[in-house]
Amino acid sequence: MLIPLLALAALALVPTGASAQNPWLERRVLNIAHQGGESEFPSNTLYAFKRSVRAGADMLELDVGVTRDGEVVVMHDTTVSRTTNGRGTVASHTLKRLRKLDAAYWFAPGRADPYRHGLKRAAYRLRGVATGKRRPPRGFTRADFRVPTLRTVLRAFPRTPITIEIKARTRQEETAEYVRNATVLAKALRDVRRRDIIVASFRQQAVDRFHELVPQIALAPGIGGAASWLLAGGSPGAGVAAFQLPITYESGGQRIPVTTAENVVRAHREGFAWHTWLSDDGESVATWRQLIDQCVDGVMTSRPVAFERTLRAHSAPAACG
């Protein structure tokens, strides 16, 4: 099985004009801390980002929403109730109100579902740090456990690559909401000179809108662009530097393979990097090793500390380049 896989990977080493200009193809395999590593640390907090980078993460993945007063903040869900002690949507809160919330309130480390509500109080070991009811771990502050602004994260990690996913504003997740948030994000990043940022969204319209306003920042395609490339051999869209896709997509009750050796080879040949996220497929050492052997350029993992151990023990095949 590995021999044909390596043969396919060797084809990806043929240089093209596009690949020569894509810095995201220059390093493999990136340990990308999804939400900062939400299975090991409280989702999308400065504490999570700092811990994952110290453990060896090469890149941070985070999600952004927009507050009622127009501030870009880092939060995975459109609502705050799953991870914090608050209620309502991100869009219904002002930044001042959002900053009072405890972003580690429902984090119970060491569990299959680390954000399960209703456990014994002792399970939520970091609850109260943000509000001053518990002393922060050594080397950290109360602010590391609150909802951060995107500006704060960029300032805290000036040399760590970051991928930013645009979220919606309500539970209905209308396309217009994504486009609006893309517009606000573009304004926030318009004068940023960094070239180690990738912007993504499930909605292609949001990605396209962001590119219209800030064409110098790299993109990952939405579902529309990815489907065009995967199913019809078309373009994934302007400004795309990397695919950020799962191992499989579920459609009609069936799992359709997406991250395959053939697709990774094709992406590399056409000058695109390939980052795989694992939320719907589960994470294991066996899965991580499979992805490394397929020559993916990055793995978006909820367990960056554990994944780093696998990376150190299992290198990408020489044919990956």
Functional labels for PLM-detected ranges:
Residues 1-20:
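Secretory targeting and sorting signals
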Residues 17-321:
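Phosphate-group recognition and catalysis centered on beta-loop-alpha active-site segments
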